[in-house]
Amino acid sequence: MRDRRSSYEYEDLLACGRGELFGPGNAQLPLPPMLMFDRITEISETGGAHGKGLIRAELDVNPDLWFFACHFKGDPVMPGCLGLDALWQMLGFFLGWSGGEGPGRALGSGELKFTGQVLPHVRKVVYNVDIKRVMRSKLWLGIADGWLSADDEIIYRAQDLKVGLFKQTAAKPAA
């Protein structure tokens, strides 16, 4: 049975990372430190900019987050690729939540724009993913647009994010 709530707390996200939320072998979030949000505040198969669903999540920012210590020394900033990865994580979660089977993989994105930075003084990051299309066949493919805001200012925009769920992706042991 899949967990179909409309919001999820941090412990739920950790359960997803352990493969406990959508069943063994299905969509998982990464575990910390690569899990890039603290809660999912809204998820729905309706609504969003395209009327086909949305997912919204938040990250509480503090100067002790792991990436500030190494990116960059004396000039701390959250790497833009981590914000992009959060959007892919959310799209994969949406596919698992929607009933897709198999582990997820990011497949790409269209246009991506960064117009600001997540710095240690930022209090909250909000991520939003608006579903454009979900293809359900052997491969489940989600296509969406997303944005990231830092303290209520949108600073990243991504178009045509793509994530797929694949029934067979397990790494084969080296010969």
Swiss-Prot record:
Subcellular locations according to the entry: Cytoplasm
Active site location: H71
Molecular functions per Gene Ontology: (3R)-hydroxyacyl-[acyl-carrier-protein] dehydratase activity; trans-2-decenoyl-acyl-carrier-protein isomerase activity
Catalytic activity: a (3R)-hydroxyacyl-[ACP] = a (2E)-enoyl-[ACP] + H2O; (3R)-hydroxydecanoyl-[ACP] = (2E)-decenoyl-[ACP] + H2O; (2E)-decenoyl-[ACP] = (3Z)-decenoyl-[ACP]
Keyword Repeat tagged: no
Assembly mode: Homodimer.
Role noted for this protein: Necessary for the introduction of cis unsaturation into fatty acids. Catalyzes the dehydration of (3R)-3-hydroxydecanoyl-ACP to E-(2)-decenoyl-ACP and then its isomerization to Z-(3)-decenoyl-ACP. Can catalyze the dehydratase reaction for beta-hydroxyacyl-ACPs with saturated chain lengths up to 16:0, being most active on intermediate chain length.
Annotated protein name in UniProt: 3-hydroxydecanoyl-[acyl-carrier-protein] dehydratase
Species in which this protein is naturally found: Rhodopseudomonas palustris (strain BisB5)
Lineage, opening ranks: Bacteria, Pseudomonadati, Pseudomonadota, Alphaproteobacteria, Hyphomicrobiales
